[in-house]
Amino acid sequence: MFQRYIGLMSGTSMDAVDAALVQIDAQGTPRLEAHHSLSFPPELRTRLLALSHTDNWQADELAGLDIAFSQLSAKVVERLLEKVSIAAKDITAIASHGQTVRHKPNSIPAYTCQIGDPTRLALGTGIDVIYDFRRKDIAAGGQGAPLVPAFHKQVFSRKNQSIAVINLGGIANVTWLGHNGNILGFDTGPANTLLDQWVQHNDSSKSFDENAQFARAGKLQPDLLKRLLQHPFFAKPAPKSTGREEFNLKWLQRQLTGHNISPADVQRTLTELTAISIKDALTTLPQQPDTAYFCGGGTRNPLLMERLTQLLAPIQCDTTASLGVDPQWVEAIAFAWLGWCFEHKKPGNQPEVTGASHPVVLGAKVLHQ
């Protein structure tokens, strides 16, 4: 027997809401049944980006975006269920990550904020909603991120193999799975977030660097790369997590002030920043992995994947597709699985990863009735 969950994920790139319909058996083994994605309406994306970049939040704007994002989430769920002709009553729960608008695990007090009103989502879809996955880990002294390593361990662990699972989302994170069952994980720095922001800054008609054409037109600027790598996050020991609060267009433009560097050269150098920071992160692991498996939107960036393959050698590089999981849907599946963990009262965090004092069951629940 299995239960069906819908995992909803929207990352720091703020480009789309991904919905994964996942069958999960009694042992917690997931199987992707179907998926659907909805792009953010341009106005919603603009408002969310503005909110994430200001310290002066307006209550009405925050509340309005909370509702608007939940409505978009309900729409993607409805479209997904229509696609597969499955009724809402056949879904155990929606596991909604929400949209992160602030993540400050190192502030005093530490906090994180995800929007997407779960009550409206539950009533709008007729399905119970599990949400608020990050705050309990932070309350237990952790970073609240990354949360997917527990899922990676469940799905990707291989006996007598040391592997790394590297998510190339807005922010990159690595999960190390040792051959003896050990696990570590942490954010390594920016992946798509700076690359996408720089493309959009230079050409508002584009949302990302398709086929890395922009980056390939540029040349690596070693001095700029050196300045970028001086960001204090890279020198921090794990556990650690980051986000747009630290790696954003304002920070990048400060590094460019007084330097005449072409936009394409900047894009090429940002690509190298992602690849180098991942390479450096892997050198801190207790044991070098035999294979690095990549997932997330960054796997579609051919230049980034080329540089990672070159820099990580002799580590073998592949995507999670070779492990049976579509690299574009790993995170949405992971949150469906975290919803299953909540329903079955199983801890969803990994204290070795987040730095929490102990394992905790992640999330809270809103009933649809």
From Swiss-Prot:
CDD domains: ASKHA_NBD_ANMK (cd24050)
Swiss-Prot/TrEMBL keywords: ATP-binding, Carbohydrate metabolism, Kinase, Nucleotide-binding, Transferase
Record EC number: 2.7.1.170
Pfam families on file: AnmK
GO biological process: 1,6-anhydro-N-acetyl-beta-muramic acid catabolic process; amino sugar metabolic process; peptidoglycan turnover
Enzyme class, first EC level, given as a word: transferase
GO MF, one annotated term: phosphotransferase activity, alcohol group as acceptor
Catalytic activity entry: 1,6-anhydro-N-acetyl-beta-muramate + ATP + H2O = N-acetyl-D-muramate 6-phosphate + ADP + H(+)
Highest taxon listed in the record's lineage: Bacteria
Family listed: Belongs to the anhydro-N-acetylmuramic acid kinase family.
Binding-site residues for ATP, renumbered to this chain: 11-18
Pathway stated in the Swiss-Prot or TrEMBL entry: Amino-sugar metabolism; 1,6-anhydro-N-acetylmuramate degradation; Cell wall biogenesis; peptidoglycan recycling
UniProt-listed InterPro entries: Anhydro_N_Ac-Mur_kinase, ATPase_NBD
Protein name according to UniProt: Anhydro-N-acetylmuramic acid kinase
Function noted in UniProt: Catalyzes the specific phosphorylation of 1,6-anhydro-N-acetylmuramic acid (anhMurNAc) with the simultaneous cleavage of the 1,6-anhydro ring, generating MurNAc-6-P. Is required for the utilization of anhMurNAc either imported from the medium or derived from its own cell wall murein, and thus plays a role in cell wall recycling.
